[in-house]
């Protein structure tokens, strides 16, 4: 195979990996449905998306696509991959030692997914890690910032019963305390933000120039809004884990500290505004993070 053909196939595989990652992180979270349907629909969509992408990547590999070479000597020592394999392995053991391995495999006893969702997620991570061109990550994370901003605004609007997506049209009044949005419910929302906000904040903290700082700072401001208003422990857990990772890296500069102070100021500003609005405007209830801190 000629070198130009090889490069074209490699670019095709890399572009496919970028599109898949963008769909999972940036497009898929905007799916709209009622809370009662999200368990089945989201699993079906996730299963289909992962299966199609993996089959396409297998086809690219069959015609000669190769993973890009690591940019440094330590790139192959990815402890995250070992963590994913360990999690998938423990899920496999717990599934086959459960009272009903079949139900555990597909998650039929409660939230849909079970072992199959874990395995497909692990396979998707491995595929993206293997073929993604790192130069495309900035674009993916920028689009993720847009998605994060949209979901944060929808969350706040739904708190005040401003229903832009028609979620309340056929919902009983007594059920409206459960948050309906692009992610369906506050725990779905919190889990999304636990993944998205560390990335959005990291992009802002490490922006290299003023222009990038502005473009990444806008999603970071909406991320601070989400951090202030989302009533879910999953978000606090995700942010806590991200902070611990940053502390372990020990590569802070005065620029990082200044931008972290801006994020903190935005958080407390949004939290104070939300506290005032909850006290003076009828809402669906829930507790802001600042109120939980006393």
Model-predicted regions and their roles:
Residues 1-11, 66-77:
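Membrane-interfacial, low-structure loops and terminal tails that flank and connect transmembrane helices
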Residues 2, 8-31, 46-60, 83-97, ...:
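Alpha-helical transmembrane segments of multi-pass inner-membrane proteins
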Residues 30-44, 65-68:
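Short, hydrophobic transmembrane alpha-helix segments
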Residues 36, 101-108, 182, 228-232:
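Membrane-interface helix caps and helix-loop-helix hairpins in membrane proteins
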Residues 41-43, 104-114, 178:
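Non-cytosolic membrane-interface motifs at loop->transmembrane helix junctions
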Residues 58-74, 92-106, 131, 160-163:
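Transmembrane alpha-helix boundary signature
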Residues 68-76, 132-140, 254-257:
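Interfacial helix-loop-helix linkers and transmembrane-helix boundary segments
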Residues 274-294:
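Periplasmic/ER-lumenal interhelical loops and adjacent helix-loop junctions
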